[in-house]
Amino acid sequence: STQGYSSAASDVYKRQDKVPDIDLNFSSGDDQGVAHKYTEELFGRDNVFRAGTIAGIQDKTAYGFVKKYAENRGLTFNDIFIEKLSAGVAGVKRTTGQHPAGIMVCPRDMDIHNFTPLQYAANKKYLKDENGRQIPGTITTHFDYHSISGRMLKLDILGHDDPKVIRMLQDITGIDPLKIPFDDQKTLSLFSSPEALGLTPDELASAIGNKGVTVGALGLPEYGTPFVRGMLEDTRPKNFSELVRISGFSHGTDVWLNNAQDLIKNGVVKLEDAISTRDDVMNYLIQHGVKPLTSFKVMENVRKGKGLEKGGSNNRAELDAAHVPQWFIDSCLKIGYLFPRAHAVAYVMMAFRIAWFKVYQPLAYYAAYFTIRAEGSFNAPVILRGLASMKQELARIAALDKPTAVEKGNATVIEVAAEMYLRGLSFLPIDLEKSDASQFLMVDGKLLPPFNCIPALGDAVAKEIVLARQDHPFTSKEDLKKRGKVSQSIIDTLDSMGVLKGLPEEEQMSLFAF
């Protein structure tokens, strides 16, 4: 029962068998920085420090160092000797840095130096901001956070795109995402069929191929990848609880493939009974009469991929005495890592809210997706030419033996754009006078792309164009180049995409102006 789990967990913390670990998700970007600052206000500036990291020399780099050493001295080493020497170099500290999310909190009645020395990350006492001004460097713990994580409280203040997407959806629609019901049937149906999108699997397959087209989860956080869409096709979840289980399967290691998937397919267990999160292990064992503390210890071992036992414990004997089924024990022994249920629930709540917008506010959903999720991967020259162009590009990437990470990212975004076109929605051409620097805008029932989705045109130049335009409209390509700080190659790209249509090359001067 939940009550049994709570009392067992309380007992564990009282006995100090587990150090609390707190993860907090904030909107990536500015909000994460604000949250980091707020911890200083909450606990005191002298009690909060960024967790330090130590970067060691990698294996390939070490191998290169040894080869270079031999070459510089005219020595000849065979490969085995080089590998032996490089093994001694690998892992040696090269520089220090800071953990992107880790915050170490020192008790108010203690000194941080009782736990760790302090230092500037990478020994840089001063840094330069984006405007070239000198600012103080970041003070971090000298020991890396793994070395002191069991001695001090660590907060993981993580940047996450989902809250950012939900905030944008609220801003552009005026709909409060907290009022979205988690039992909405149309939204739930997306995870087992694309029917709520007004599409059939055949229509989707004709545009994006056959992977995961019998569900409508394309582009949704947690569920949008081909792997997880395949999970949805195997399980056809019917409620929120089953969505949480699938999130647990996808975040775990060796939890789904060759484990829960086989048990469900072979009829050994149902979806709701298979192990998907850490809590499942502990709850199941308590329900079978295993002692709460033993149940907790087994869960801790299983979640870390360490099986049932640790250091001479007698956990297996207790499980056998409680008649725990063999399938459950076998499943535990296969697991490499298990996700916590509360974490999965938080992710699924955000994913479900975004899915609701996909069903009921499609244009807003795609505007938020392309603005935040597709940043840097929106292939404007391909997508803005229409569905046929997208199909052709997807076929080209699918035919590659080893597509690059950029091509894979582009393909995912093109698939979502193709789905959008199939739903009867479309893009406007990029407009020199109306496009935003970085946000897709909803204009007359269509999406207006921003400047930063143009190849090689980054955020900084996109902002310069918008700032210059606010002063007064561009009068020529020469004017755009000068005031918008745009290079000739980008001018050529804009020209080829039709963005500069009707704009003269140079300033036109009238005789009557004199």
Predicted regions and their residues:
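Noncatalytic, beta-rich nucleic-acid-contacting surfaces in large DNA/RNA-processing enzymes
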Residues: S1, S7-F514
